[in-house]
Amino acid sequence: GFQPSVDALVAQATSEQRVLDAATITGALGNIHSSAGVDLHFWLDPTNYAAFVEAVGTTLASVDPANAATYRSNVAAFVADLVALDTAYATGLKTCTSRTMVTGHQAFGYLAARYGLTQVGIAGVNPEQEPSAKDLAAVAETVRSAGVHTIYTETLVEPKFAQTVASSTGATLAVLDPVEGITDASPGKDYLEVMRANLAALRKGQECS
């Protein structure tokens, strides 16, 4: 993952440079655990992301007081966008017929918890962790028993296991983006656009009125 590169940058920091450990912020948000590990995708809950942005803004203002007003203004504007996004999700997913979302891997736990959905991941928290035949059979049984009609793949993850479950159950495939990086394949140019595209995909896939 990205951690070795992050560790290298931290090691190169000079005494004049301040390093903010994001884990001190995200840890306070409450980690989502599963048997497969810890879900680090806290930003998929817009309220978590807002808390993170505010904490980072406060730190930047303290180390660069000359530009504190700019930091505060930018933070306030982005947090307002995140509040609106949270409202759109809460409203848009309130009436979904299906409350079980089957995903390529367990990246959407924060989103599911925030909006009253149950996430079932084909792979674990690490998308490179390949599911066994037993795992695939268990997910397929959940798809059938829960009446799931849509299985979500991801822009940066090989969809072959999702395709296997879909072909055995008759479910269709749709794309959800965990916003791990913006690429040409992303359904938007920034976090807000990608999250709005995710909401549209969820409303269709979860059969929301």
Q: Which role fits each region the language model picked out?
A:
Residues 1-209:
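Extracytoplasmic metal-acquisition and chelation regions
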